[in-house]
UniProtKB/Swiss-Prot annotation:
One of its GO terms (biological process) is regulation of DNA-templated transcription. It is found in: Cytoplasm; Nucleus. This is Protein AF-9 homolog. Its main location: cytoplasm. Component of the SWR1 chromatin-remodeling complex and of the NuA4 histone acetyltransferase complex. InterPro entries: YEAST_sf (IPR038704), YEATS (IPR005033), YEATS_dom (IPR055129). The lineage of its organism: Eukaryota, Fungi, Dikarya, Ascomycota, Pezizomycotina. Component of the SWR1 complex which mediates the ATP-dependent exchange of histone H2A for the H2A variant HZT1 leading to transcriptional regulation of selected genes by chromatin remodeling. Component of the NuA4 histone acetyltransferase complex which is involved in transcriptional activation of selected genes principally by acetylation of nucleosomal histones H4 and H2A. The NuA4 complex is also involved in DNA repair. Yaf9 may also be required for viability in conditions in which the structural integrity of the spindle is compromised. The coiled-coil domain is required for assembly into the NuA4 complex.
Length: 268
């Protein structure tokens, strides 16, 4: 972490967000995924856990290192992965059981931010409330994908880090140099209008889903619809229960009245 006096002041009333993905992918050993030599016989799957940018964009300009704390039965169970521009933070292993993985994020020195901790549950088998949800976890090549969309929020970042985060979005793989020689630079191309191409150094989210990219504005809209439908169902259930309660209260009042009338008649 850089000395605070070199980072400038905090940019007040400012929040910068950066989307990223935390997840794991597992695949059972088979003819198409043979068990490597030297792997114990009781290991049933190969798997990897990762932290990466949305649509595989580079996140090493704000994240420099990730620590993965695996199950203690795994040799060298605390793995430190240094950032390489353009590559995800990944650990690959084999095993037979599911467990919680502790993930610690270390930000670039210019951020002045302390590390933060996340948790991810390694899934080797599909899960869900029904078969449809379970099958949705299995990709076409038989992999079990357990991914979650996350957003890193930097609240009132230091000026140096704020300038780094907001230096401008660029297309993936774009280089400022236009050719050999000094002074030959080029400006980035026009910003995309369809929003289905995610640029580097941005908080962009693709407009539509595609293979290997389950998170998009389309996904968000589908989740909002599900929540709206669930809210509507909950409201209908509440109305039905209230109507039943009202009917039972009226029935109770009628029975009380009949009992009082019968008691009065018996006395007279």
């Amino acid at each position: 972490m850089a000395p605070q006096n070199q980072l400038g002041k905090r940019v007040k009333l400012t929040q910068v967000r950066r989307p990223f993905i935390v997840g794991s992918t597992a695949k059972p050993f088979s003819d198409t995924n043979p068990r490597p030599a030297g792997i114990p016989d009781n290991h049933t799957h190969s798997w990897q856990v990762f932290v990466k940018g949305l649509d595989d964009t580079d996140i090493t300009y704000w994240l420099r290192r990730v620590q993965f704390k695996l199950h203690e039965s795994i040799p060298n169970y605390v793995r430190m992965v240094e950032g390489e521009p353009g590559k995800p933070f990944t650990v690959e292993e084999t095993g037979w059981g599911e467990f919680d993985i502790t993930i610690k994020l270390y930000y670039v020195n210019d951020s002045g931010e302390k590390p933060q901790t996340l948790y991810h549950y390694l899934r080797l088998h599909p899960y869900g409330r029904n078969e449809e949800e379970k099958q949705a976890m299995i990709s076409s090549n038989g992999e079990i994908c357990s991914w979650s969309y996350e957003e890193q929020l930097f609240n009132e970042p230091y000026e140096v880090f704020y300038n780094l985060l907001t230096q401008g979005a660029i297309p993936k793989g774009w280089k400022p140099s236009g050719g050999k020689g000094k002074g030959k630079t080029r400006a980035p191309p026009p910003f995309p209008t369809d929003n289905n191409e995610v640029w580097e150094h941005s908080a962009m989210i693709p407009a539509h889903n595609r293979p290997g990219q389950p998170f998009s504005l389309e996904t968000e809209a589908a989740e909002i619809r599900k929540l709206a439908e669930a809210q509507g169902q909950a409201e209908d259930m509440a109305k039905k229960i209230l109507a039943e309660l009202k009917a039972k209260e009226e029935q109770l009042a009628t029975l009380k009245g009949e009992n009082q009338a019968a008691a009065a008649a018996a006395k007279s």
